[in-house]
Amino acid sequence: MPIKPNFTAADIRARMNQEIERRKRGLITQLLYIGEECLKQARSGHKYLNQTGNLCSSIGYCVLVDGEIVHEGEWKQTSEGKGGEKDGKTGSSQGVAFLHELAAKQTTQGIVFLMVAGMPYAQYVEAMSLDVLDTSEQMAERKIKAMRNRLFKTK
């Protein structure tokens, strides 16, 4: 008596696609947590003198899937500062613009994590060994690598 399958090749494909989507959602959710941790680190762990609040307000992240933004971190305007305008509005708007500009240039298919400091002088502050995104970048790389190993390890 032969054994007959009670499923089709289409059933197998559908099940595989479900599993892929489940893992994709898990990956995106983990990236959101990582993004929030890195954002918190970047905004609170800096050593530079925050004069206007713009640099701190220009820091943000997003997650893209196939070139489309599926989630963007909250843009908080900080009013910490030692002089001048201290509302962080300029930083926040430049951060959003820079993040969206970079996201539009992404040609990578799949899931992409982007984190930016949108003020034009951020690289100069980094060059003076004052942490803007360095520590957050290292944290993100470490956590994303650990997450990939955890989510996609073979049993």
Question: What is each stretch, according to the model?
Answer:
Residues M1-K76, G81-G83, D87-K155:
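Short, Lys/Arg-rich flexible segments
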